[in-house]
């Protein structure tokens, strides 16, 4: 399928630190790509660079085959960008903010009013449409912000943390809304929510230190990871000697100690019983065993966990 957005060896440096490290990939038209990773992994920098707000030190970004930096006006007209934090004009009501935004895109008055009505209904902020932004909760500001992003009907959407500050019911409403756009819009969004990334994506990108650590559909990434299990054994007292002995077992992967808990990964369930034999004389508080999921994939492919 044709790529709607393409990156060619894109690199970005901020304060002497590489935040995007030579990224090259294409994003299929009409698909949804979720970008996850620890803080400062490059997620926000990626969206700002695709939008054209941040110029890369090297490389190029293309939207519909047009260079974002060289053909700024043409590409900006087809891109909607939603920042993580609301940036409404505090002197205008939500309705006036949306009106102003639509006029920037030269929307006809009748179409503009129709779009405002339908989006405010669909995203659940119509009853607050004539209120000032600061009087709304952060959740309703987020809904209105999403409505503003979709208002001029752009076909490329770049969204930072679409459901941050929303309650669970509102999260599901936004997820359903985004999935309704599949096929007609190319959506790239960043998130700290494991549940969100698992639920809403055609493609999942895990970033770490400006690089793509993993890229693909979740079930394929899990399949490629093979059988991987995460174990946690909570002892009443975990001595250094016991920790060292358990860590030396060759089938134990990435062992660590968190308080009195021995945390490790393994390719086979039987490794858990091998470890328990070493600790048979010790008093246990609890234990847990889980097959690898997205959260574990992120932890094992990045240097820091998502917080």
What residue ranges belong to the model's regions?
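Catalytic Walker B motif of ABC-type/P-loop ATPase nucleotide-binding domains
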Residues: 157-161
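Conserved ABC transporter NBD signature motif
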Residues: 59-70, 74-75
